[in-house]
Structure formats: structure tokens, C-alpha cells
Amino acid sequence: NYVTLTNMSDADVERIITYRLEPVNISFQTMNPELRCRMLQNRFAGDALKKAQRFYEAGIVMNGQIVLCKGINDSAELESSIEKLSRYLPYLQSVSVVPVGLTEHREGLYPLEPFTREDAQKVLEQIHRWQDRLYREQGTHFIHAGDEWYLLAGQDRPKAENYDGYHDDRVMTRGIGLH
């Protein structure tokens, strides 16, 4: 399960650190505090990112997720988020990027657009570029695309070795690397 950290008190953070309750799975969405507030419709959502910094400083193992919304937290925003999240290595072990799930039951909700094949190809190019860079610099691919991106783009999914030696529940329960 992933948490946004918005409802987590400072006492909760200290308890996690004291008792080493890890890993903490965080739904980041974006590292832009203002955008995160808008996306989560919570005025404290941007401040919640400081809690992830606190976990990092305490050496708490984390995993992350970004639910990508077309035209909102993709492209340049995704680039910035990956760059900032990679600073949390090695304690932030991996980040999965998945497309927002859209259904026909969206009446009264913020209008979101589905990603196209071309969009998915661009997202994969961006993620693969970061994977190559981080593997060279840090020895980890770190950022992983949800299987939906490969299906939508019409591309084969990566081999198990691209999951940095842990092709297990840490990534598979997030829809990453299911073969």
C-alpha cells in the first residue's frame, strides 16, 4: 500500500524512524509542492514531501510511485521529479511510474485525458534515458515504467535483470515487470 504522507503526523514519522517500520511506500505524484497540493486537493500535500526527506535522513528504506496524468505531471514535471527523487538514493530504492487509471465514471471530477501510443513511447524514452544514466552513475535503474506503458506503446517489457536484482513483490505488486 502507498501513502501520500498528507495525514501522517510528525509523531507518526518519529515512530516509523524509531521502530524502523520499513519500507515506507510513498505515492509522490510529483516533487513540485504546489502541483502536488493541486493534484491531491490538499493544501498540506506539498509540505508532506518534507517527511520523505526526514525518512531519507534517518536511513529509512522507501519505495515510490508516480501516477502520471497527461498534461499535468508528465514531460518536464516528470523529468524534474525523477531528478529530485534520485537524490534519495540509496534509501529510496525504486520508483514506479504508472498511468492514471481512467474509467467512464468521472462525472464531476477533474477532466483527465488518456495517454496515446505516442505519449507512452515518449514516457518510456524518458524513463529509459534516466535508467541508463542512473545505472551508469549509481548502479541501479531506480525508475521503472508500469507494464501499461509497454502495452500502450506496443513495446516488449524489459527482462528481469532490468529490475536491479529484485524481481519480486517490491515491484511486481505495483504492476511492474509482470511476465
Please identify what each model-predicted range represents:
Residues N1-Y91, L102-W130:
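Conserved Radical SAM active-site core
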